């Protein structure tokens, strides 16, 4: 008695426009494109239902729990300006739906199933509001921006990096030689490419040994602390941690992980190891464009960036901004702030749908990488500020005099731009002149 089987509209249960969100709710903003004939309210309610407690029909066991306590709620829907049949659906999820400290569970719940739903032509997760009650259950960055600067004894400027090229094919000894040339030229870091793991031409243990030799030799010559992002990504978590242990035993200061291909569970495991053992953790976002490139379907990178800050990483690649449209610049700087700052106000012009309070969670260094060179230095210095890593691959190796002179050119340009900025010069207007003066 009281149970009535059958299919009913999702909006009768999961669309609640009068709902007042709680401080402990996880809030999501979805860009949805309903199928023709599907009302926006039904589509939004379907998203809330299928990513929380709902299924396609009423079930007897609904009566054995409190749906009001556990269900997701679509509490607001707004049309997207300038787009036909696109809406932003706001969904609130009770905190008890999620396992503490697990990005894996968070993503499995919110985006694990609903993206293939028939009522929707397309769906994109634009933003998440993570309440402090949930974010405090995560490890966060193993060390964060300030501790990294203290470890490196480097302040008042962006850090400089370089990816070793060719990314595949070098022997371990030649690879180590390239690392040494860059670091002695003035870079702070060099980097394994994301797809350098342990291939037949260069096994990981050989690479780690020759890179460690290059690190210590360049440190002795320059008097500066140097690092190389030793990619610990592997086919199993056990093998990944074995590589991280070997890096620590060699005295390396930093390791690297491909967090999307490696997975959030592996990434969080590595972050715990890095915090416990004093290793910095560099994160590459390989595979991100598969997820975030389409404007109306997938997951925006700002969500992946927030997830990484919770899962754990001290650096993450975040695009370059340089040469892009102004609107994209603002959106990129929006998620750069979400990586670095403690408190970020809602600002739709920057793509930030919710105010995010990270409380005391350490910040992550954004890494500008990809197609940049020394003449971009003034713009990069102005846009990203000091708390960033500027990574020049071809922009270092492509120097006509070789690797070390390429590194010298980048370091000289960076220090000239920082000094000019500190003297009050306008880098946006005078940047090229600053770099030319530094060439003399």
Curated annotation (Swiss-Prot):
Binds 1 Mg(2+) ion per subunit. Mg(2+) binds at residues 191, 193-194. Its cofactor is Mg(2+). GO terms for molecular function: magnesium ion binding; monooxygenase activity; ribulose-bisphosphate carboxylase activity. PROSITE patterns: RUBISCO_LARGE. The record marks 324 as: Transition state stabilizer. It is found in: Plastid, Chloroplast. Its EC number is 4.1.1.39. InterPro entries: RuBisCO (IPR033966), RuBisCo_large_chain_AS (IPR020878), RuBisCO_lsu_C (IPR000685), RuBisCO_lsu_C_sf (IPR036376), RuBisCO_lsu_fd_N (IPR017443), RuBisCO_lsu_N_sf (IPR036422), RuBisCO_lsuI (IPR020888). Keywords: Calvin cycle, Carbon dioxide fixation, Chloroplast, Disulfide bond, Lyase, Magnesium, Metal-binding, Methylation, Monooxygenase, Oxidoreductase, Photorespiration, Photosynthesis, Plastid. NCBIfam families: PRK04208.1. The basic functional RuBisCO is composed of a large chain homodimer in a 'head-to-tail' conformation. In form I RuBisCO this homodimer is arranged in a barrel-like tetramer with the small subunits forming a tetrameric 'cap' on each end of the 'barrel'. Belongs to the RuBisCO large chain family. Type I subfamily. RuBisCO catalyzes two reactions: the carboxylation of D-ribulose 1,5-bisphosphate, the primary event in carbon dioxide fixation, as well as the oxidative fragmentation of the pentose substrate in the photorespiration process. Both reactions occur simultaneously and in competition at the same active site. This is Ribulose bisphosphate carboxylase large chain.
């Amino acid at each position: 008695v009281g149970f009535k089987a059958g299919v009913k509209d999702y909006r009768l249960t999961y669309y609640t426009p009068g709902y007042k969100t709680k401080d402990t709710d996880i809030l999501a903003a979805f860009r949805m494109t309903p199928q023709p004939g599907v009302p926006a309210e039904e589509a939004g309610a379907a998203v809330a239902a299928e990513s929380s407690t709902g299924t396609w029909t009423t079930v007897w066991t609904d009566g054995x729990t409190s749906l009001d306590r556990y269900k997701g709620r679509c509490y607001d829907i707004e049309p997207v300006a300038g787009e036909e049949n696109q809406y932003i659906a706001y969904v609130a999820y009770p905190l008890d739906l999620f396992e503490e400290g697990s990005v894996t569970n968070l993503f499995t719940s919110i985006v694990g199933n609903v993206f293939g739903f028939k009522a929707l032509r397309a769906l994109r997760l634009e933003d998440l509001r993570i309440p402090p009650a949930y974010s405090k259950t995560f490890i966060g960055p193993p060390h964060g921006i300030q501790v990294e600067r203290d470890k490196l004894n480097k302040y008042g400027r962006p850090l400089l990096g370089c990816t070793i090229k060719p990314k595949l094919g070098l022997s371990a000894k030649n690879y180590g030689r390239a690392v040494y040339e860059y670091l002695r030229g003035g870079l702070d870091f060099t980097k394994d490419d994301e797809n350098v793991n342990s291939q037949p031409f260069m096994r990981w243990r050989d690479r780690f040994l020759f890179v460690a030799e290059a690190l210590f030799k360049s440190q002795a010559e320059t008097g500066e602390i140097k690092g190389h992002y030793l990619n610990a990504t592997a086919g199993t978590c056990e093998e990944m941690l074995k590589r991280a242990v070997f890096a620590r035993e060699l005295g390396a200061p930093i390791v690297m992980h491909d967090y999307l291909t490696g997975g959030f569970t592996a990434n969080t495991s590595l972050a715990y190891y890095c915090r416990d053992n004093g290793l910095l953790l560099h994160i590459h976002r390989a595979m991100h464009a598969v997820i975030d490139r389409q404007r109306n379907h997938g997951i925006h990178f700002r969500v992946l960036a927030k997830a990484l800050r919770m899962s754990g990483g001290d650096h993450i690649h975040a695009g370059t901004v340089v040469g892009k449209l102004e609107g994209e610049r603002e959106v990129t700087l929006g998620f750069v702030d979400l990586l670095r700052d403690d408190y970020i106000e809602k600002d739709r012009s920057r793509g930030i749908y919710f105010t995010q309070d990270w409380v005391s969670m350490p910040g992550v260094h954004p890494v500008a990488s990809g197609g940049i060179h020394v003449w971009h230095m003034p713009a990069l210095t102005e846009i990203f500020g000091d708390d960033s890593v500027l990574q020049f691959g071809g922009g270092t190796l492509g120097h006509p005099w070789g690797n070390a002179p390429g590194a010298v050119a980048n370091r000289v340009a960076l220090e000239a731009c920082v000094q000019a900025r500190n003297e009050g010069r306008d880098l946006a207007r005078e940047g090229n002149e600053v770099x030319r003066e530094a060439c003399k």
